[in-house]
Amino acid sequence: MSAQLLILSHVVLLQLIVAQLGPKIGKQFLKPKQCEITNQTVYDFHAQMLNGAQRSLTEYRNKVLLIVNVATYCAYTMQYRDFNPILGSNSNGTLNILGFPCNQFYLQEPAENHELLNGLKYVRPGHGWEPHKNMHIFGKLEVNGENDHPLYKFLKERCPPTVPVIGKRHQLIYDPIGTNDVIWNFEKFLVDKKGRPRYRFHPENWVQGTAVKPYIDELEREI
């Protein structure tokens, strides 16, 4: 195969991967789900950063957190473009976004940890994109299945799923399938200033962030 044909085949494959969305939903499922409040908080967990260091989530005490499982080659990837303006408009710096790359949905995050930031900067969303100082991108992890990260196990236990159907089996790169699973890239959990998960949002429940902003404002007003 010539070099040109090889490049073309890779481009076509990438386009097919990016085109894959999670399960389609009706408008009745776009309302966020409220989470069960318990004594356990996200501060009980730590996660690996891109450089391999472990970070305790206690560093985010008294912050409102938007926790997102992200992927570079997903139809929802352009939501990255909305994160910086939302954080930039948060004048008191209370809001932080924690991005957790995951490759479990149709292999849409194939990069290694050291490649992720360059992929975001030069490929998708590209155009020199870099994260706001209050957006923290962690190392790759698994959000579902046998090896789901303890943080995500906790979030799924506390917050009901946003839709009754998870998706097509061939698009889900993990086992076993659970009823509370994260359904696709860019699902979001909103955490209050005490570290308690409060709301869970479907990836399509976004609209440049306007669908989530009222709930962020609600938690920021709380003492």
Swiss-Prot record:
InterPro entries: Glutathione_peroxidase, GPX_AS, GPX_CS, Thioredoxin-like_sf. CDD domains: GSH_Peroxidase. PROSITE patterns: GLUTATHIONE_PEROXID_1, GLUTATHIONE_PEROXID_2, GLUTATHIONE_PEROXID_3. This is Cuticular glutathione peroxidase. Residues 1-19 form the signal peptide. One of its GO terms (biological process) is response to oxidative stress. Its EC number is 1.11.1.9. Glycans are attached at residues 39, 92. It is found in: Secreted. Homotetramer. GO terms for molecular function: glutathione peroxidase activity. Coiled coil: none annotated. GO terms for cellular component: extracellular region. The keyword Cell cycle does not apply. Could inhibit the oxidative burst of leukocytes and neutralize the secondary products of lipid peroxidation, thus providing the resistance of these parasites to immune effector mechanisms and their persistence in the mammalian host. It may also be involved in the formation of cross-linking residues such as dityrosine, trityrosine and isotrityrosine identified in cuticular collagen. Highly cross-linked external cortex may also serve to protect the parasite from immune attack. Gene3D superfamilies: Glutaredoxin (3.40.30.10). It catalyses: 2 glutathione + H2O2 = glutathione disulfide + 2 H2O. Belongs to the glutathione peroxidase family. SUPFAM superfamilies: Thioredoxin-like. Keywords: Glycoprotein, Oxidoreductase, Peroxidase, Secreted, Signal. The active site is at 74. It is an enzyme of class 1 (oxidoreductase).
